[in-house]
Amino acid sequence: MEGLSNGWKPIRAYWQDPSETNRAALRAFLTPETTYWQYTHGVPDTSAVSPDGYSLDNFYLTRPGTDEVQLDLFGDYKSNVALYPDFQAYFRTHKPPLLAVWGKNDPFFLPPGADAFKRDVPGAEVRFLDTGHFALETHCNEIAAAIRDFLAR
């Protein structure tokens, strides 16, 4: 799937075979270390990432039963990916104004996924920022300005 990194490999394995073994392999995504990594990977200056986001995520991830809910969501994300062709058909047919702001160093959603919007909506505006998955953590003002500018047109 275009735009999805190899980081999805264990999740895709679970989609293909929702066994307890594959489900257990996804628990690595729910550790405090992985949550911190998701917030900081690809960020040139990790001191710009407030601990609020990953600390709050970790607080909620450690609540009883939350791990099972998250694992169910990983499994269900397959239904979202299955709808990608429908989203793309909508974009090709209706050509809505489209702004995609992307962390160019996102370890899960790669730049080709954002660039694909331009294939379906030739006027799509795609911006890449020097950051990771949680682009708002480090580029909130820049993203807000891009959205305001986009909506003003």
Regions found by a protein language model. Give the residues of each.
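Residue-level detection of beta-strand scaffold positions
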Residues: F128-L129, R153
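Short, hydrophobic alpha-helical segments
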Residues: I147, L151-R153
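Flexible "cap/lid" subdomain of the alpha/beta-hydrolase fold that forms the substrate-access gate
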Residues: M1-G123, R127, E142, R148
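Catalytic histidine-centered segment of alpha/beta-hydrolase-like enzymes
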Residues: T131-A144
